Each structure stands twice: as C-alpha cells, then as structure tokens.
C-alpha cells in the first residue's frame, strides 16, 4: 500500500465558484473525495491539503518524507510561477511528483507560461479540468507499480 499526498495551492479552496469558465464547477471537496475513493479502491492511502500560505505547503512537503509518502500530486496554482521555495522543498525530499493545473496555463496570460516545477516533475497535466487530478493519480499509481 502506497501513500499519496495531494497539495492544492492558493485560491483552490474557492473552486466551484471562482471563475467557473476557467476552473470549472467542481468543488475542491468533490475532487478530494473522488481521489480518496479511487486511491482506496486501488488499495492505497491518499492525504490532501489546501493552503493559501506557501510556508504551510512547504512544511507539509517536509513532513511527507518522514511520514513515508510515496508520491505527491501538486497543483501549486499561482505559486507555479513564483515559488523557488516550493520547488526546493520538493527537490529536498526526493519524493516524485506530478504537477497538475485545471486550466491550460499555456493558453492564458504570458506570465502563467513559466513553471518552476515542470522541469523537475515526473509529468505535467494541464487544461483538463478536474479530470486532470484523476489522470495524475492514475499516472502516479502506474509509476509506483513500475518501481
């Protein structure tokens, strides 16, 4: 049994009501519930945290190593384009991760095109809405099965 951690960055607590044309109508609670059910059905344990505070996400990443987390799914949200600290935390713990974005960041404002995570992630999924989380989970489980 593997343990997976899903991290949601700033403003994702507003999913379902925040710019539904961009981010969809699915709530964060619905995304988390779906991922928990899928992980459990596959015989794994899934944890999740949403925070608007960079330091809380960093602290959670640090704790993940001592807790034996095997894989991380992260939607850094706006921190994607700004946070060297989150990138460094992920590199420091050496836990593989997949970067997830609800919207296609490459079809949006130019400042959203750069990610501090993509080049060190196992993979990146963007533009598929809430389904992107499901696909990231499936990919993570495949990666874990192959290792």
From Swiss-Prot:
Pathway: Metabolic intermediate biosynthesis; chorismate biosynthesis; chorismate from D-erythrose 4-phosphate and phosphoenolpyruvate: step 3/7. One of its GO terms (molecular function) is 3-dehydroquinate dehydratase activity. The active site is at residues 23, 101. It catalyses: 3-dehydroquinate = 3-dehydroshikimate + H2O. The record marks 18 as: Transition state stabilizer. SUPFAM superfamilies: Type II 3-dehydroquinate dehydratase (SSF52304). The keyword Lyase applies. The keyword Lyase applies. Belongs to the type-II 3-dehydroquinase family. Homododecamer. This is 3-dehydroquinate dehydratase. It comes from Stutzerimonas stutzeri (strain A1501) (Pseudomonas stutzeri). The gene is aroQ.
